[in-house]
């Protein structure tokens, strides 16, 4: 990140989590929250041209001058959300469900306030599949099928939460109940629209977790997310309508969500 900032100016953001597909495919396990907290500190200090204590030594990039790097934390579970509020510059929520987003954003903000931080200084990013389609039952069914893989992917993290906290935790039931029929996950199909083992994910979950439909529906949902405090949306395009979705976002969705600026007032 410091190298990229040196080359192209301060335009990078570090997104970090405990680890999923990259570590599980190599038979590893997600890291601990303690290690995550320490990693955030080390990465942020080095990425901001500052010295940091690491393994008994003081480290710094001698060539780095004036680099600026925010670290955004991806999280789902209560303790990870608490950590995010305590030390993260931003929060990455990998789903677009309005109710879950409201609960998680509030949890992160409360954790920030509890340690004396200003929650308004935290960025909130929602990352989820976006698919532009027609307002017909056939198109709706196709969009849902193309994005069902996402519910399976999120289900990995949800399964970890249920294992750790149980079914009766503070985590919203809308996030945990749907994995009851989950029997496993094949990372060879990770993030693919033709994932063949996500039948347990109901249509309703796909609708809630993703942003689907006409341009007007996308705009309406993104405006609701913005009202909850979301400051950035990162759309996934793992489906069969990439170009059209991108075109409509560029021509219609983004302009509708961007405050107008006049050249002369």
Specify the residue positions occupied by each region the protein language model found.
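Short, flexible active-site-proximal loops enriched in glycine and acidic residues
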Residues: 7-17, 48-55
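Well-ordered beta-strand positions
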Residues: 45, 89-90
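An alpha-helical appendage that flanks or caps ligand/catalytic pockets
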Residues: 29-61, 106-107, 112-227, 258-265
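A short acidic, helix-capping loop that chelates divalent metal ions and anchors anionic groups
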Residues: 22-27
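Structural motif
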Residues: 7, 86-87, 228-230
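Short, acidic/polar
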Residues: 75-86, 214-224
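Active-site-adjacent beta->alpha loops and helix N-cap segments on the catalytic face
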Residues: 97-112, 241-247
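Hydrophobic faces of well-ordered beta-strands that scaffold small-molecule active sites
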Residues: 12-16, 71-75, 91-93, 122-129, ...
């Amino acid at each position: 990140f410091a190298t990229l900032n040196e080359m192209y100016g301060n335009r990078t953001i570090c997104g970090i989590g405990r680890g999923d597909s990259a570590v599980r495919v190599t038979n590893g396990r997600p890291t601990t929250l303690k290690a995550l907290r320490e990693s955030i500190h080390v990465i942020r200090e080095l990425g901001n041209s500052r010295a940091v204590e690491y393994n008994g030594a003081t480290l710094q990039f001698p060539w780095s001058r004036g680099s600026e790097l925010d670290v955004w934390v991806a999280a789902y579970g209560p303790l990870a959300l608490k950590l995010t509020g305590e030390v993260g510059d931003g929060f990455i929520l990998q789903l677009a469900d309005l109710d879950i987003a409201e609960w998680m954003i509030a949890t992160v903000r409360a954790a920030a306030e509890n340690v004396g931080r200003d929650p308004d200084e935290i960025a909130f990013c929602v990352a989820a599949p976006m698919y532009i389609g027609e307002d017909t039952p056939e198109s709706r069914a196709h969009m849902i099928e193309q994005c069902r893989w996402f519910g399976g992917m999120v289900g990995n993290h949800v399964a970890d939460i249920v294992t750790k906290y149980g079914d009766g935790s503070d985590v919203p039931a809308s996030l945990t109940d749907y994995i009851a029929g989950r029997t496993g996950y094949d990372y060879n199909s990770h993030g693919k629209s033709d994932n063949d083992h996500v039948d347990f994910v109901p249509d309703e979950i796909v609708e809630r977790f993703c942003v689907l439909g006409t341009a007007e529906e996308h705009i309406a949902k993104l405006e609701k997310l913005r009202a909850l405090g979301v400051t950035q949306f990162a759309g996934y395009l793992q489906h069969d309508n990439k170009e059209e979705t991108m075109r409509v976002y560029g021509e219609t969705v983004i302009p509708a969500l961007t405050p107008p600026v006049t050249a002369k007032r």
